[in-house]
Amino acid sequence: MYQKMNKEKKLSANTPSGFVDRYGKELALKENLIAKIEENFLKFGFSKLETPSFEISENIGKFLPDEDRPSSGVFGFQEENNSWISLRYDLTAPLARYVSQNYLNISNPFKRYQIGNVWRNEKPGPGRFREFTQADCDIVGSSNPLADAEMCNLLADTLNFCGLEKNQYQIKLSNRKLIQGLIENLKILESKQQLTVLRAYR
């Protein structure tokens, strides 16, 4: 029976565009790098958080173009009750949802890190995948500039710990208030255009 089905329709021996397999030395290198990153995050006093791969589409922070489709940029699925869920686009939206859901039970400031796969329904290209691993670290609930300084120190220390020299990387700072001021000054009112500007300055 199986042989008959196999003759009728052969499986495609290719991964979908923008997705890759990893095996052997390449996978071992990735896992070793993740282990070093995690070790350094813990050294700085951050706690690990794990969230689902799926989030309610509205919580992803995208804008639905119409009632019948999920937004572009994410892999969305419609459930039987007509609600939408999406594979997480990054690890920031799940953090915001978690903090909102558990704000009475978490420490303040809340120092957490998360390392996991994210998915983007975008055109793939060289070095640009539709599934990749992201390492995210945040301090939530502190307006003290020392928190920003700690994040810069953490990033530099982690890159050094992973084997990079100081002249091999740059740390660039951004402030959403400045970007928001640019959007207001340019009088960009349409939500999708605002999102494009925000992405350009990431």
Language-model-derived ranges and their functions:
Residues 2-202:
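Extended, charged alpha-beta segments that form solvent-exposed binding/catalytic grooves
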